[in-house]
Amino acid sequence: TLEKKGAYEKYRPDVVIYDVLGDVVCGGFSMPMRRGYADKVFVITSGENMAIHAAANIAMAVENFKNRGYASLGGIILNKREVPREEEKVRELAEDFHTQIIGRLDRSELVMEAEEAGKVLLEYAPDSQMAEEYRKLADQILAVCGEERPC
């Protein structure tokens, strides 16, 4: 884990992103919040029904943890899959949890190409439109958290 390896102390990150399976809302998911490593949680989802269901479960868990003094829900990020009524479904999810969609990521073949090349997209195609979408999302997350990205 990051804690056991001393990563928090060594790197002192402003933002840490945990990618967890949406259908597994369990102790591993909540540990960063309970240990004080998270102030805000952002839920990423597409408009697919199972993804919406999983995102709702995570948002509900975050709301329960917030009531115990842990992290709060910072917003929803739409990872587009181009399914029917996608925007509408995700907007309804955000409304149900009194939050907002803070970012939208278009579906991109470049992401899969980067993965096949063993790189992250910003390394694989730093000047691409998709890389710009990720930078914009980073700025939006920092804005919600009350921070700014250094120039």
Residue ranges and their predicted role:
Residues 4-10, 15, 20-104, 113:
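Conserved catalytic-core segment of NTP-binding enzymes
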Residues 107:
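Active-site donor-binding loop signature of nucleotide-sugar glycosyltransferases
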Residues 110:
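Conserved Rossmann-fold dehydrogenase catalytic segment
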Residues 117-128:
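C-terminal boundary of histidine-terminating zinc-finger modules
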Residues 138-149:
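Short, hydrophobic alpha-helical segments
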